[in-house]
Amino acid sequence: MNNSLWQQCAERLQSELPLQQFNTWIRPLQAKLNGETLTLFAPNIYSVDWVRDKYLKTINTYLEALCDDKVPNVVLKVGEASPTQRDSGSPQRAAATRRKTPNFSSGNTDVEVPFESNIHPEYTFDNFVEGKSNQLARAAAIQVAENPGGVYNPLFVYGGTGLGKTHLLHAVGNGIMAHKKDAKVFYIRAERFVQDMVNSIRNSSTNEFKRYYRSVDALLIDDIHFFANKKGSQEEFFHTFNALLEGNQQIIMTSDLYPKEIDGVEDRLKSRFGWGLTIAIEPPELETRVAILMRKADERGLHMPHEVAFFIAKRLRSNVRELEGALNRVVANVQLTGRPITIDFVREALRDLIAAQEKLVTIDNIQKTVAEYYNIKLADILSKRRSRSVARPRQLAMALAKELTNHSLPEIGDAFGGRDHTTVLHACRKIQELKDAQHDIKEDYRNLIRTLSS
């Protein structure tokens, strides 16, 4: 057995299964072969159960045919295989694991050997669905891919969970390597940087660790907020950051938070995060959510009527990951029942998700959350007062109600002290103008959405 075992098995599954089934259930799996155990990591428990029930017997049959000696025991888990242990999850992922990374935990620190980029080839700019919520971040990322080490260095992308930040990082990596085949592009999570640093200290290989991280052409580091309250890691990254910038090597970072909002990180590091370009990815607006669903369904070989995509997108609003989870459930129900995809079918398949979302976000909840955020009374939100300290939060609350609930403009107006629909429409347009022009309003709106969607 070797590290191509799962890749060979996945290739056989790809040749036997319908494309829709393979893309939905097999392609997302990541594998770790450890002795006589082959662990398959799935994105969620629903996928684990489905693969176990529908495909495990076939997987075992293929493994028996591929193995000359003892067949590994297959274990299904929720999670991800670590990059250094990951087997090729599908034929398309083999290219992403062709390079070897120094193992600082074992003292193997030869920085001259080829390294693992950790870049997933399937994440590109072409399949990143663009909308108003992310178009600036995508445009900046494309500029970096075409001109690494240029004016947008460092690039700091922030936004809530599941909005596409990691996709953009991999797309940049693929773009850089497309322009320069031998580019040394390295994607990691901040947690991995911390682990490598700790291992290098334990094994007296800190010099090798420093040379390795400072030798890359582009460092793409995800979830930079993980450095919070880790002073040693912050100190090392501070010097790594400076060395890379001095060498015109590209740095791209992502975080759930705006740099200045990351508690537990030194001010000098926060300041450096903003030296280049800091840009937000917002929760996708309705049109983008529809486009994402249509694209993802098409990738799975599934025809989704536009009105069905609109129905789902109108009710599930928080992030792309939530939409993908809903789509996976729809696909599974289609395969299980053979029924056509209609609004009634989707309403039944997603009834618990929709009910949870509608229970979570109500106009009343929005009003209370906005009042608390701005430290004003709920009665002020509902009053006729027109002072800016009250009028602006009221307009924000109206705009949030339009975006996060299914209520009509007249219904929203009625909930805000009997105002008419034109007042609500004006508030929504005004807030959009302010979001485009004023960073603080944009941040307030983003923070409120995050609070209401959590």
From Swiss-Prot:
Mind telling me which Gene3D superfamilies this protein's record contains? Answer: 1.10.1750.10, 1.10.8.60, 3.30.300.180, P-loop containing nucleotide triphosphate hydrolases
Which residues lie within the region annotated Domain III, AAA+ region?
118-334
Q: Per the record, which residues fall in region Domain IV, binds dsDNA?
A: 335-454
- Domain of life of the organism encoding this protein: Bacteria
Map out region (Domain II) in residue numbers. Answer: 81-117
- Give the InterPro entries listed for this entry: AAA+_ATPase (IPR003593), Chromosome_initiator_DnaA (IPR001957), Chromosome_initiator_DnaA-like (IPR020591), Chromosome_initiator_DnaA_CS (IPR018312), DnaA_C (IPR013159), DnaA_dom (IPR013317), DnaA_N_dom (IPR024633), DnaA_N_sf (IPR038454)
Map out region (Disordered) in residue numbers: 79-110
Q: Where is this region: Domain I, interacts with DnaA modulators?
A: 1-81
Composition skew (Polar residues), residue ranges: 82-91
Can you say where in the cell this protein is located? Cytoplasm
Q: What is known of its domains?
A: Domain I is involved in oligomerization and binding regulators, domain II is flexibile and of varying length in different bacteria, domain III forms the AAA+ region, while domain IV binds dsDNA.
Q: Explain the purpose of this protein.
A: Plays an essential role in the initiation and regulation of chromosomal replication. ATP-DnaA binds to the origin of replication (oriC) to initiate formation of the DNA replication initiation complex once per cell cycle. Binds the DnaA box (a 9 base pair repeat at the origin) and separates the double-stranded (ds)DNA. Forms a right-handed helical filament on oriC DNA; dsDNA binds to the exterior of the filament while single-stranded (ss)DNA is stabiized in the filament's interior.
Q: What is this protein called?
A: Chromosomal replication initiator protein DnaA
